[in-house]
């Protein structure tokens, strides 16, 4: 289980901590932020990209496959639901769409290439985003 604490004192800079590491998020100048850190969508995409790279590395280590490097690039955008060719259910309005480009470097045979392509979608963050999330929210005031 992962745990993150976020604190905003003023402006748009949010200080984040998991108890061992600290980092921050912000909005770009055009959204009235100070651009001192990645925005929330960039943090989401960085989680997905890191998970993809780590999942591939751990799989290769487990199978004894030599992996030279992985570069994962993700973009998020909103598209009209009617333009979504991958969507199972018809939806109205806009949907969020994540596009990826994953470059896996190494000397792989055809079977390994096929399997590594499948492993990309097996990263836990990808699975979470694909199947949806149940939220339990508790808001308090003082």
Stretches with model-predicted labels:
Residues 1-46, 57-142:
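Extended beta-strand/beta-hairpin segments
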Residues 48-52:
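Alpha-helical metal-binding/catalytic segments enriched in His/Glu/Asp
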